[in-house]
Amino acid sequence: MFDYLENEEVVLDELKQMLRDRDPNDTRNQFKNNALHAYLFNEHCNNVEVVKLLLDSGTNPLHKNWRQFTPIEEYTNSRHVKVNKDIAMALLEATGYSNINDFNIFSYMKSKNVDVDLIKVLVEHGFDLSVKCENHRSVIENYVMTDDPVPEIIDLFIENGCSVLYEDDEYGYVYDDYQPRNCGTVLHLYIIAHLYSESDTRAYVRPEVVKCLINHGIKPSSIDKNYCTALQYYIKSSHIDIDIVKLLMKGIDNTAYSYIDDLTCCTRGIMADYLNSDYRYNKDVDLDLVKLFLENGKPYGIMCSIVPLWRNDKETISLILKTMNSDVLQHILIEYMTFGDIDIPLVECMLEYGAVVNKEAIHRYFRNINIDSYTMKYLLKKEGGDAVNHLDDGEIPIGHLCESNYGCYNFYTYTYKKGLCDMSYVCPILSTINICLPYLKDINMIDKRGETLLHKAVRYNKQSLVSLLLESGSDVNIRSNNGYTCITIAINESRNIELLKMLLCHKPTLDCVIDSLSEVSNIVDNAYAIKQCIKYTMIIDDCTSSKIPESISQRYNDYIDLCNQELNEMKKIMVGGNTMFSLIFTEHGAKIIHRYANNPELRAYYESKQNKIYVEAYDIISDAIVKHNKIHKTIIKSVDDNTYISNLPYTIKYKIFEQQ
């Protein structure tokens, strides 16, 4: 009988005959099945009268077989049987619905004949809707992933306890493979499961289902662990309905938002994904859909979405730019100025469709960490260059270049010393600044803090830039609103002796240096810098010691005395009608000192090496001797020349050749 029930087309009369001789509750078989188990496992099980006959014959509907399944549990777990509503009802009613939670609702939902009335019966008689399936998904989560979920059943599940709004305390899962928040909302699951129609029975995303889920409080703006909204998945669909797109846009205030994918390092987002053929199912872009995204997108997101695709799909991006109004396009151009490497053909395309390179665009480009001289030259030419003369929110535009290391480029001290002509190959930032300087009407323009470009360059330790600015006419003596000079900044903030020496070489006024010393924050730790300033001021005025701040003069009194001693000694030594001091420390002396290279007094002083502080005097004399010897050799060689110079007196020849 059991073999008959399990494998044959069961006929009621034949079964009645068998039941006269056999016990339907005889479970002495391999699988411990009773007669109900056997029939419900039959792939031809579709006759409710057979089930009723077995029940009327006393078959136990609550008996558990070897898998610990009751008949209804075996029936709803069978993969090759379509659940018949009448059979299920007969099994439930036979136990007074005590076996209701043996009903495998997950298997049932996967079948093609889900009956709303049967679901209602289950719900009305207390079916536990909080049950989870093997992959730990809930009833509603599994149902929306079936081939063609029905809004009425979704309503039924949700209204009777299936939660679709995850609370923070609901994530007590210990499973690594699934957590609700990771997979986003139920709306995410529905969209992802219906992106592509794999068979005739599997429906595309339907607007009525989307509306149903949204009406139950699911926010389309919610994101999953990949930062994706449901709409971001939907635009990958093989069949996109613009009305569904509008539904999924609810609550998303920027459909052009973008982010960098941690795994691929690509720009992602709703609009970015749709424009990227790697994420889009259909080959062609729907411009109506793009316009919808543009209308609800913000300029920065739009820019981030289209720029990465420019190189690979210029035609599409050009078409998109052409559809924008000029105001939006202008905003996009301005945002693009700080994006990274600027592609001039893309800028040209934006300009063609109504954008302009204006002051704001230039100012934004100064904030670009990948700034380059070629692009700057192009932009300034388009704008006219006046933008560099206007403050950017109280800041000097060029000053932004001083603030950080742009890209992988640094400012090298030797760059400027080797000449600006090669600068573009060594340091793009210096080259860029050099391009801007001719447009700058006042190199000493001040920002909202009263600081100049030189102040910024010193503060950020840009030695080559400091050198460039000084050679271009920057004033060392300007004080900021808080009274700080570049010298003060070099001592207190940069702590860069080379910068300090560079500033002192450009001859700041005595008052500037004295004021700078007054602002030194730590007269102990900055001893070397302070001594450099004292050393410089003593050359300018031997009465400086009375003007130096008292705290410094007291601490460095011995150093001041030694400076005075060395300088006074130099002033006593006469060399051909000039003092040693004037030859070494005055502009006139610098022009004639080589003429006295063989003077005994100069030689004696040079060979004594007695200075402890003003040791540079010996380098100056050494250079003068080298220059004198070079001139002398040139004169000796000219004796053999048959020219008018060879017949001139030695002193005349000397004056001629020293000009060379």
Curated annotation (Swiss-Prot):
Superkingdom, taxonomy of origin: Viruses
Cited Pfam families: Ank (PF00023), Ank_2 (PF12796)
Coiled-coil ranges (or none): none
Keywords: ANK repeat, Host-virus interaction, Inhibition of host NF-kappa-B by virus, Modulation of host cell cycle by virus, Modulation of host E3 ubiquitin ligases by virus, Modulation of host ubiquitin pathway by virus, Repeat, Ubl conjugation pathway
Gene3D superfamilies reported for this sequence: Ankyrin repeat-containing domain (1.25.40.20)
InterPro entries, per database record: Ankyrin_rpt (IPR002110), Ankyrin_rpt-contain_sf (IPR036770), Multifunctional_ANK_Repeat (IPR051165)
SMART domains, sorted: ANK
Cross-referenced SUPFAM superfamilies: Ankyrin repeat (SSF48403)
One GO-annotated biological process of the protein: symbiont-mediated perturbation of host cell cycle progression
Region PRANC/F-box-like: start-end pairs: 578-658
ANK repeats: 31-64, 101-131, 135-166, 190-222, 226-257, 268-302, 325-359, 449-478, 482-512
The keyword Acyltransferase is annotated on this UniProt entry: no
Function: Substrate-specific adapter of SKP1-containing E3 ubiquitin-protein ligases which mediate the ubiquitination and subsequent proteasomal degradation of host target proteins. Prevents activation and subsequent nuclear localization of NF-kappa-B in infected cells, by targeting NF-kappa-B RELA subunit to the SCF E3 ligase complex.
Subunit structure: Interacts (via N-terminus) with host RELA. Interacts (via PRANC/F-box-like domain) with the SKP1 component of the host SCF ubiquitin ligase complex.
Family the entry assigns: Belongs to the orthopoxvirus OPG023 family.
Name of this chain's protein: Ankyrin repeat domain-containing protein OPG023
Native organism: Monkeypox virus
Lineage, highest ranks first: Viruses, Varidnaviria, Bamfordvirae, Nucleocytoviricota, Pokkesviricetes
Gene: OPG023
